[in-house]
């Protein structure tokens, strides 16, 4: 099986149908996705999204998408999504979520950094961007730790529970990642 990533402490494997229950459980944890506009997704919506990622893996490395399950000592602790936003400019987007009990140990930073490196080395990527709720200070700090640059602020372009929020855009270019 390709697209497996290992770090000193973590194993990242491409998501498969057996992982959908974990993704659903993770996505329903309020603290993990409270800044997202679709934080109360139904099982059917989560399953549809997971199947989209599984199908889009076939288009890698020039286009497509992949979702990794992050494991620590064979326990699922989070997930990372990477997908092509524009195959002409080789612009990709990254997203992530981790179980709250694993916050503060550097696992998210370690995994995101490994995915960025893997993407630049194995996929046709020029730029990787992360778009996050401007109130999500922990995610903003993570982006900075892994070498991403804050590009700007999109004003009131996302809605969470009926309230508009701003979005920060962070990115890293292939020439910057080392």
Predicted features and spans:
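Acyl-donor (CoA/ACP) binding surface of acyl/acetyltransferases
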Residues: 1-34, 64-178
């Amino acid at each position: 099986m390709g697209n497996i990533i290992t770090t000193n402490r973590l194993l990242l494997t491409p998501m498969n149908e057996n992982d959908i229950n974990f993704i659903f459980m993770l996505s329903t944890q309020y603290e993990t996705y409270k800044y997202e506009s679709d934080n109360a997704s139904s099982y059917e919506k989560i399953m549809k999204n997971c199947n989209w990622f599984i199908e889009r893996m076939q288009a890698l490395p020039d286009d497509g998408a992949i979702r990794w399950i992050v494991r620590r000592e064979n326990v699922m602790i989070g997930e990372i999504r990477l997908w092509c936003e524009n195959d002409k400019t080789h612009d990709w987007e990254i997203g992530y979520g981790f179980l709250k009990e694993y916050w503060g140990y550097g696992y998210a930073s370690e995994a995101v950094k490994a995915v960025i490196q893997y993407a630049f080395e194995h996929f046709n990527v020029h730029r990787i961007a992360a778009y996050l709720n401007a109130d999500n200070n922990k995610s903003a700090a993570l982006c900075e730790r892994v070498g991403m640059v804050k590009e700007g602020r999109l004003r009131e372009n996302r809605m969470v529970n009926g309230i508009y929020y701003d979005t920060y855009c962070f990115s890293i270019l292939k020439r910057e990642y080392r």
